[in-house]
């Protein structure tokens, strides 16, 4: 019976020695995520248990959604009895209790922005209490109403075709839900011809008819509010389009023929007004005689003719002279 008592006594003393030589830091944070509207103030609760000494240090850091804890960036830290805010949130981050040496290390973040959404780490170090790292995690979501969505349209908007209407907000937390509705008193599309996805914001319209034309509205909503956009859908009949195309082609053909006929008639009228060409002395043909040669030949011909006309008189005079000589 003595040995169990001795064993219990020894174990108690050993446990006390371990506890005194180094206590485990215990950090407590809320287990539920925190959601706060944009522009408001968030209080991120953090408490701890340890025997605060000269080596006590506290650090708050931030991790963006989807990134590992190793990618955290400091928000503020307390060491050597002084508080040091740092980073892009330095002017909006303070401690609710300063100095945080009484077991409370709550972080107060003012004027919340969408970029503040993420995970916040409350880290307490108090050497020689190294048995745990004293880390607590808090998830913060900054609530933002949906921004004005953008409506878009794609597909074949003719009779019998299909069209896809899109709707998307650039901002909104939590993510908005999208709902499409048709405005006016137009008949409701047949079941199955109008399918929408509330998550992606897409509306699929199949087997379009002329009655599918109209105004469609998309409403993006979350717990912070709603916003909407509208789109006008115009369904055309392909047969009417072909008839219109044929008519336009015929009209263009008639117009071109009219222009061609007008130009031809005008050309003929202008041609009749032009004077007829006459032959000029300066114009030479390939088989024509040079002007100088023709004039010389003409002069010789005239001279010969003149001699022929005078030849009888000359002959008589010669004969008379000859007769007189003989008489002498």
Curated annotation (Swiss-Prot):
**TM stretches of this protein:** 245-265
- Ig-like C2-type domain: which residues? 145-234
Where does the record say carbohydrate is attached?
Answer: 139, 207, 232
Q: Which residues lie on this side of the membrane: Cytoplasmic?
A: 266-328
Which InterPro entries does the protein's record reference?
Ig-like_dom, Ig-like_dom_sf, Ig-like_fold, Ig_sub, Ig_sub2, Ig_V-set, VSIG2
Q: Signal peptide span per the entry?
A: 1-24
Q: What is its main location?
A: membrane
Q: Give the source's domain of life in one word.
A: Eukaryota
Q: Which residues lie on this side of the membrane: Extracellular?
A: 25-244
Which Pfam family is an annotated match for this chain, by its short name?
V-set
- For the keyword Transcription regulation, the answer is no
Q: How does it sit in the membrane?
A: Single-pass type I membrane protein
User: What region holds the Ig-like V-type domain?
Assistant: 25-138
The places in or outside the cell where this protein is found are: Membrane
Which UniProt keywords are present, listed alphabetically? Disulfide bond, Glycoprotein, Immunoglobulin domain, Membrane, Repeat, Signal, Transmembrane, Transmembrane helix
**Positions of disulphide bridges:** 46-122, 167-218
| Tissue expression notes | Expressed in the stomach, colon and prostate.
Mind telling me which SUPFAM superfamilies this protein's record contains?
Immunoglobulin (SSF48726)
GO cellular component annotations of the record: plasma membrane
- This protein is called V-set and immunoglobulin domain-containing protein 2
The organism named in the record is Mus musculus
């Amino acid at each position: 019976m003595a040995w169990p008592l001795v064993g219990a006594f020894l174990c108690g003393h050993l446990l006390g020695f371990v506890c005194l030589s180094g206590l485990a830091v215990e950090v407590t944070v809320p287990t539920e995520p925190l959601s706060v509207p944009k522009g408001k103030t968030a209080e991120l609760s953090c408490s701890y248990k340890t025997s605060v000494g000269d080596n006590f240090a506290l650090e708050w850091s931030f991790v963006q959604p989807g990134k590992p804890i190793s990618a955290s960036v400091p928000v503020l830290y307390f060491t050597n009895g002084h508080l040091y805010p740092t980073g892009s949130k330095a002017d909006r981050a303070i401690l609710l209790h300063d100095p945080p040496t009484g077991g409370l290390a709550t972080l107060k973040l003012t004027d919340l922005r969408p970029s503040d959404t993420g995970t916040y780490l409350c880290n307490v170090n108090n050497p020689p209490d190294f048995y745990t790292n004293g880390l607590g995690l808090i998830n913060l979501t900054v609530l933002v109403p949906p921004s004005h969505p953008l409506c878009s349209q794609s597909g074949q908007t003719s009779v019998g075709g299909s069209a896809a209407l899109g709707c998307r907000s650039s901002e909104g937390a939590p993510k908005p839900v999208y709902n499409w509705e048709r405005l006016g008193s137009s008949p409701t599309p047949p079941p199955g011809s109008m399918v929408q996805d509330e998550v992606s914001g897409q509306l699929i319209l199949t087997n379009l008819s002329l009655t599918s034309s109209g105004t469609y509205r998309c409403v993006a909503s979350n717990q912070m509010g709603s916003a909407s956009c509208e789109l006008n859908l115009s369904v055309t009949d392909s047969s009417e389009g072909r008839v219109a195309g044929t008519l336009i082609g015929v009209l263009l053909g008639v117009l071109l023929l009219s222009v061609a006929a007008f130009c031809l008639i005008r050309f003929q009228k202008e041609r009749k007004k032009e004077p007829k060409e006459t032959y000029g002395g300066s114009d030479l043909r390939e088989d024509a005689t040079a002007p100088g040669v023709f004039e010389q030949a003409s002069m010789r011909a005239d001279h010969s003719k003149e001699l022929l006309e005078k030849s009888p008189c000359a002959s008589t005079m010669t004969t008379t002279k000859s007769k007189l000589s003989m008489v002498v």
